[in-house]
Amino acid sequence: MRIWIRADANEEIASGHLARTLSIAGELRRLGARVRFVLSDEESRSWLQRLSGNPDEWEMSVLGLSYGKPGEELPLLAKLAEGERPDWILVDSYAVSGDWFEKLRSTLAASLQEKQGKENPAPRLAFIDDERAFDPEADLVINYDPDAESLESFYQKASFRLLGPKYAPLREQFADLKPAVRPSVRKILISTGGTDPYGMAKRLQKLVQCVPETAVMAPGYPRVEKVAELLLGCDLAISAAGTTLYELCAAGVPTLAFSMADNQELFAKQMAAAGAVTYLGDIRNPEGLEKLEK
């Protein structure tokens, strides 16, 4: 089975889309699928190579477009599919819309039919969604937000729906962890995700100087390969509200979460409502930053 993953990363959208699809790609490859990442530009290629730790680990195709122009990539995707027809295309992007999925399906079908001279079904489409902005014209939709199981009626167009935390795309190293009981706080983890536009890592380090040991996962700090092992050794975490929150839950680490983007704010509030984290607020607002510093 051939599967394409259409995702990007840059300073604007950070690395979450590629990070979670890398987890999915690893499992798909283990099951025997051939996976190709289809990226907007060279910046996304650099992010993927950095996140995977091996520049040659994954097959990649770069469309040569600026991020955020999904309409312009439709003919390029169709042309690419003529040479290597995928069985599935998994899309993880905030730039697309409901109309885009309909146009992608019809563009692919028309291109393949013209190329092969007969009716040929277009690749199936899958979509990872955490914004709930539209009901995608997809064969499969994935939403692993804490309250996503209540969205069954929202996603009417998808043939299959994978909804709720049990579908969170955690890496294999987080399977079957055995968290330890933490009687005191001697080691704190600070995590900002793939980007740190507000310099929170250094600011937080200054705030927790009284703690004997601090670990940091943020841009400009040494890359951590064995993340699960690191998390198991931490007694408390202060983390941006990305998929890392699910990893912290898997490791049983009590977590103070903050947000610095709109999608993070929604996710953090959902995780707090579920009792999984304590949400301190959005650091883009003075109130949230003040609460975090206290």
Where are these regions (language model features)?
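Catalytic binding pocket for nucleotide-activated donors in carbohydrate/polymer assembly enzymes
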Residues: 245, 249-292
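Active-site and donor-binding regions of nucleotide-sugar-utilizing enzymes
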Residues: 6-15, 20-33, 38-51, 57-156, ...
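Short acidic alpha-helix that forms the nucleotide-activated donor recognition element
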Residues: 224-234, 249-250
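Extreme N-terminal starter segment of soluble prokaryotic enzymes
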Residues: 1-4
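Acidic donor-binding loop of glycosyltransferase active sites
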Residues: 232-243
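A conserved mid-protein helix/loop that constitutes part of the nucleotide-sugar donor-binding site
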Residues: 19, 195-207
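A nucleotide-sugar donor-handling region in carbohydrate enzymes
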Residues: 136-198
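Catalytic donor nucleotide-activated moiety binding site of glycosyltransferases and closely related
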Residues: 212-221
